[in-house]
């Protein structure tokens, strides 16, 4: 089963894709946000191209585990995306993935000016890999919810 991972942001959406066995996530692309129609069109094209059956979208819980205003935006986007594409969209905790992605790029010697486009797709791959690891260890928590819940 191919799964697409998304790191949703106001200006960009990082995109990652898992391998056909569902074991590893790879950074794929960064969508520069222009409009809902543009965003969903690009994501729909990726879903068709890679025969994606599910999307995992980062859910930005606060460090204390509570939901903030950005969570509401992700829920709205995920619900609209699920309705438009007709495949499940699962929210998955993304706490500190962007910070981790920035640290990885820094340690790899990527100059700060070149990180902007890469950090989002790398964060998406970290979110998706976390989800894949939980599946493989059968540790999907009961509170992992899809876009229709909450």
Curated annotation (Swiss-Prot):
GO terms for molecular function: nuclease activity. GO terms for cellular component: cytosol. Its EC number is 3.1.-.-. It comes from the Bacteria. Keywords: Cytoplasm, Hydrolase, Nuclease, Ribosome biogenesis. Pfam families: RuvX (PF03652). Transmembrane segments: none annotated. It is found in: Cytoplasm. InterPro entries: RNaseH-like_sf, YqgF, YqgF/RNaseH-like_dom, YqgF/RNaseH-like_dom_sf. Its main location: cytoplasm. The keyword Hydrolase applies. One of its GO terms (biological process) is rRNA 5'-end processing. PANTHER family: POLYNUCLEOTIDYL TRANSFERASE, RIBONUCLEASE H-LIKE SUPERFAMILY PROTEIN. Could be a nuclease involved in processing of the 5'-end of pre-16S rRNA. Belongs to the YqgF nuclease family. This is Putative pre-16S rRNA nuclease.
């Amino acid at each position: 089963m191919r799964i697409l991972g998304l790191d949703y942001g106001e200006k960009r959406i990082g995109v990652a894709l898992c391998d056909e066995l569902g074991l590893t996530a790879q950074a794929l692309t960064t969508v520069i946000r222009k409009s809902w129609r543009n965003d969903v069109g690009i994501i729909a094209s990726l879903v068709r191209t890679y025969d994606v059956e599910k999307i995992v979208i980062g859910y930005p819980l606060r460090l204390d585990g509570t939901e903030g205003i950005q969570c509401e935006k992700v829920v709205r986007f995920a619900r609209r995306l699920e309705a438009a594409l007709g495949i499940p969209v699962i929210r998955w905790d993304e706490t500190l993935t962007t910070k981790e992605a920035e640290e990885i790029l820094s340690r790899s010697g990527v100059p700060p000016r070149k990180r902007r486009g890469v950090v989002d797709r790398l964060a998406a791959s970290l979110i998706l890999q976390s989800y894949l690891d939980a599946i493989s260890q059968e540790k999907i928590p009961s509170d992992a919810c899809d876009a229709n819940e909450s």
